[in-house]
Amino acid sequence: MQVELIIKNLNVYNSYFKKFIKGDILINKGKFLHIGKGYEDRLWSENVIDGEGKYIIPGLIDIHMHIESSMTIPREFSKAAIKHGVTTVVADPHEIANVFGIRGIEEFIKFKGNLDIFYGIPSSVPSTSSSLETTGEKITHNEVKRLLEYDNIICLGEVMNFKDLIEDDDSNINKIINISKEKNIPLEGHCPKIQGVDLSLYIYRGVNGDHTQQSVGSLQEKIQNGMFIEMQHKSMTLENIKFLIENNLYEHFALVTDDVMADKLVKGHLDEILKEAVKLGMSIENAIYASTYTPARRMNLLDRGTIAPGKLADFILLDSIEDFNIYEVYKNGEMVFNRDKGLKEEFFEDKSKLDYRFYNSIELNNITKESLEVKVPNKYKNKVNCRTMKVLKNTTFTEEGEVTLNVYNNILQWEKSSCALIAVFERYGKNNNISFGLVEGEIIKEGAIATTWAHDHHNLMVMGRNISDMTIAANEVINSRGGYVVSKNNEVIAKLELPIGGIISDEPIEIIGEKLGEVRSAMRDLGYNHMNEIMSFSTLSLPVSPALKITDKGLIDVKKGSIVSLFK
């Protein structure tokens, strides 16, 4: 029997024994046909390659990520990710859903990349409720029914609305979960700092996966209660990895990326998380297992994730396993990336364009300096105690603080304080909301930052040390149809345009990455000190991430799930 491809003399990763075994691989019709030896008198090919002792592993599978986090479209994401050995992803498009609703999800699904992109249904759009944040659209149980008909929808995306989930049987999120259960798909969670009975109630509803930041304690409690853990970068600590190794928990977690910024994507993706696990003490064999086999099983992708007869021939050839140096990447038995030759461009032939309406979504006039004046109620005379959001250096969580500020003519005098002012402007043309907050910590010491890439509602958010720079930065974002802008001394010093929904661009990923790198550098130059400046700032607006956040409706006490006043 003739087969399409034979690669000889390889060290083949075997998922079942978690070790490398010397042998050959035979591929036919995009799938592995035979692994090993003893085939010569029965199977042959006109296309035989000498593997020269290279290491072959399954293509990497990332089961929790957001393409919009890379600020790009599926085609450009595919081209970038496949260079890093990623051949399958499960994307939760809840960012585009918050802006455009089901129309955005369906457009994203049609707007193909050429690695396998499966999707989770955004379950929490908005992330909380319309009483706490304004979004462009909503996803209800009716839209979920429609989306479940798509073949490449394979799970329910992260369930963030914890309060409604456990307190209201008739809530939209419980209706969504009940519909999803009928399809027997995985239900993905988002449950940071939820524990005890609250965690049990959360799991009882059927949500049994979590990707949020973990500690040893949360890992133990969640896994022993049946949760599958998705380990992203901020959970990759020495203590966490040691706990997983010592307790032999390899069947209960996978490595994922969640959010990879464009400037980071050009350098690495899931391969970087894998290498980080190895640096922290995990064997390369087990790190590969957690990046291929367990994620495939979690998402019922039983046709991939291992090198075995009948499985998809998605694989990576490595020069060595010590440095995880990728030589080639194959998709469905076809070489799509070579380290020396680059991408096989014809593999990425999709040239479709988004509808023009996706490029004009900012319904907001230019703001004025007067609109940034914080008016104080008459009952406060010369001074007022204010809540603050304290930015923490190594997490996207905040702490609530307090500061006493002067009041003059009912206007808050904040510019000479230790705090920056933050404001959120509703951008969908629905209610013209404006809210204010105060931010402290190792943030900018001068200038301003503005963005519509503000999780998850993606309204216009601006933070600064003076009203003039805040106005300039915010208006530059509006005039760019969305984006990220940094200003200083009344000038724009860095800018990334994101005209699609105010959150993504269709420029090549290298250009997006370069511009985002300039924004990141400018934020650092202004004094922002954080492990990920972009995510730190952009999640100040995320009302499901502890402890005090801001939306267009006001300051949100995340634990209570309620609006609290800036003034105490």
Curated annotation (Swiss-Prot):
GO terms for biological process: adenine catabolic process. InterPro entries: Adenine_deam, Adenine_deam_C, Amidohydro-rel, Metal-dep_hydrolase_composite, Metal_Hydrolase. CDD domains: AdeC. Keywords: Hydrolase, Manganese. GO terms for molecular function: adenine deaminase activity. Its cofactor is Mn(2+). It catalyses: adenine + H2O + H(+) = hypoxanthine + NH4(+). It is an enzyme of class 3 (hydrolase). HAMAP family: Adenine_deamin. Belongs to the metallo-dependent hydrolases superfamily. Adenine deaminase family. This is Adenine deaminase. It comes from Clostridium perfringens (strain ATCC 13124 / DSM 756 / JCM 1290 / NCIMB 6125 / NCTC 8237 / Type A). The lineage of its organism: Bacteria, Bacillati, Bacillota, Clostridia, Eubacteriales.
